[in-house]
């Protein structure tokens, strides 16, 4: 049995994108062109923001919404494959009349390849799908190619925040960032990665982990070359 026989990625996405409400369907249709890959280059023409943050796989958009509301002078970009999450965040963006968020629907790697060199100040990868089965590891967002593109698109001294409650993908991601010569792991001692920064916003998945007495991994990598 080959990989495509064993797992249909399109069916997986379809199952996650079901049950859109009428309002969610309507707002997705309205913003269809603005959240497409073709419109990504338009972001880079925006010059009024001094700090630009990208979140890969923002889920329901809790962090993006929180940050955009609290830091109106920063630009926040989000990429997601989950239509329901995009739609819900679009509704919240309209509700709060936010101008400092840009959203994109699709594959994060495709967007990273489109980004300008030395463009982003930070990249967030918060509790990504761990794809626990070995045959699905190729689906993990962190790999050699994506880390290279992350490095290229980040400014010097830019940072990557990578949080997860899954041990397998924690060490998987750590390995790829450590092996990339551009990044330094911002840590004093190894166990520091199990301590969260109190000021950080607690996401839905982080909250679930903490309620189960699971201490997530909190990684910060700095681009130093």
Predicted ranges, named:
Residues 113-122, 127:
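A short acidic, Gly/Pro-enriched loop at the edge of an enzyme's catalytic core
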Residues 82:
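Conserved SAM/SAH-binding beta-strand->alpha-helix loop
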Residues 142-156:
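A short glycine-rich, Lys/Arg-flanked "PGG" loop and its adjoining helix->strand segment in the class I
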Residues 175-225:
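Class I S-adenosyl-L-methionine
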Residues 157-164:
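Conserved beta-strand signature within the Rossmann-like core of class I S-adenosyl-L-methionine
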Residues 1-52, 62-69, 90-117:
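S-adenosyl-L-methionine
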Residues 57-60:
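Class I SAM-dependent methyltransferase "Motif I" SAM/SAH-binding loop
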